[in-house]
Curated annotation (Swiss-Prot):
It comes from Arabidopsis thaliana. Belongs to the universal ribosomal protein uL11 family. This is Large ribosomal subunit protein uL11x. CDD domains: Ribosomal_L11 (cd00349). InterPro entries: Ribosomal_uL11, Ribosomal_uL11_C, Ribosomal_uL11_C_sf, Ribosomal_uL11_CS, Ribosomal_uL11_N, Ribosomal_uL11_N_sf. One of its GO terms (cellular component) is plastid. Binds directly to 26S ribosomal RNA. The lineage of its organism: Eukaryota, Viridiplantae, Streptophyta, Embryophyta, Tracheophyta. Keywords: Ribonucleoprotein, Ribosomal protein, RNA-binding, rRNA-binding. GO terms for biological process: translation. The gene is RPL12C. GO terms for molecular function: mRNA binding; rRNA binding; structural constituent of ribosome.
Length: 166
């Protein structure tokens, strides 16, 4: 038998969910059951927390559990932030699979997303984080200021575009 959990201990649990949907309680149970929490209630809390801003998007949710209380925090991925910046109408996830987004976001949006992602980035400088976000834009399939994100990455590398540090 595994050792009993100390209730005052703080435990972080990360779960991938679709915003605004109550995930299957069975997928939450093995992660939060041993912590003494009801998976169904936590599923509803997550759905309520993600319904407003992240409806229909896949986001990671951080559950901070202490004294049998769970605090829900949304930890969005770069792709989720880019798709949110596109401001596209929500699609039915079950009907439309592997969506290619063909919108356009401004370079200022990319810099804002890079500032949000900065603590989790591997890059040394903000310009490196901006290039990471531009790479995500390529994967999502959107353009930045009407240009291909790869061209913008080359302009940053050659020094044509200057990115402020922080």
């Amino acid at each position: 038998m595994p050792p009993k959990l100390d209730p005052s201990q703080i435990v972080d649990v990360y779960v991938r969910v679709t915003g605004g949907e109550v995930g299957a309680a069975s997928s939450l149970a093995p992660k939060i059951g041993p912590l003494g929490l009801a998976p169904k209630k936590i599923g509803e809390d997550i759905a309520k927390e993600t319904a407003k801003e992240w409806k229909g998007l896949r986001v990671t949710v951080k559950l901070t559990v202490q004294n049998r209380q769970a605090k829900v925090t949304v930890v969005p991925s770069a792709a989720a932030l880019v798709i949110k910046a596109l401001k596209e109408p929500e699609r039915d996830r079950k009907k439309v699979k592997n969506i290619k987004h063909n919108g356009n976001i401004s370079f200022d949006d990319v810099i804002e997303i890079a500032k949000i992602m900065r603590p989790r980035s591997i890059a040394k400088e903000l310009s490196g984080t901006v290039k990471e976000i531009l790479g995500t834009c390529v994967s999502v399939g959107c353009t930045v200021d009407g240009k291909d994100p790869k061209d913008l990455q080359e302009e940053i590398n050659s020094g044509d575009i200057d990115i402020p540090n922080e």
